[in-house]
Amino acid sequence: NRIYSQSFYPFSYFTKEWFYNLHTGKGNMLLSIILLVSSISILFFIITGFKISLKSTLKNIKIKYLSSDKESKYVILVGSEKGNTFEFAKFLSTQIQSFGERVIIKPLNSYKIYNQAETFIILTSTYGEGDPPSNANNFVSRFKKFNQPNKINYSIIGFGSLSYPKFCAFAVTVDNLIRPTDNFKEILPLMKINRSSIIEFNRWIGMWNSSELTKIKFNEMKIET
């Protein structure tokens, strides 16, 4: 019952061993399984998150430029945080092109002078507590800076959710900004759409088609079943 040798390990040694076993699951099968499942889950969320982000970015890039700033009679300006509103813009631009008209889709932050423009269609969502989306946060200042040389007929559509108290608040801001401008003529009153409702969007199309200020008449968007 004699002790022939004795070694004392510092606290850092035990800490290192504890973290090593915790991260590797050494000596504990259940812990190893939990760590494996956790690692796979983290990898899954990283990959899917990257794919969603990339898809949203490419969606914005692919449909942004259809014609040039200098020759487009129709300008579709979009405010969107996640890119969903661009789908409605793309739907309208395709039909405008089918009539042989030149059209361009741009984010609201790219607002500038459009020498040939006659019609603006503005589609914008609202971010947070009534704030503009990230691609529209400079629109108000740019609108005040650039004066269009022609008379512009315009229509504004706001996208939002009635579950938020400030439903389509930024679209209201844009409407209040543009309406008093002398050379801008409102085609339709501000349209507010809840949760990207295609039914409500088609209601706007019906009103657009009935207006005497519109030359192009749109087909309704199909509801996917």
Language-model segments: residues:
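Hydrophobic alpha-helical scaffolding
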Residues: 5, 40, 82, 126-129, ...
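Glycine-centered flexibility sites
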Residues: 25-28, 49, 79, 83, ...
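N-terminal beta1-alpha1-beta2 submodule of the flavodoxin-like/Rossmannoid cofactor-binding fold
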Residues: 55-125, 130-137, 141-145
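Conserved histidines in hydrophobic membrane contexts and catalytic metal-binding motifs
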Residues: 1-74, 147
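Short hydrophobic alpha-helix segments
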Residues: 3-6, 96, 190
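FMN-binding flavodoxin-like domain, especially the glycine-rich phosphate-binding loop
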Residues: 99, 116-118, 122-225
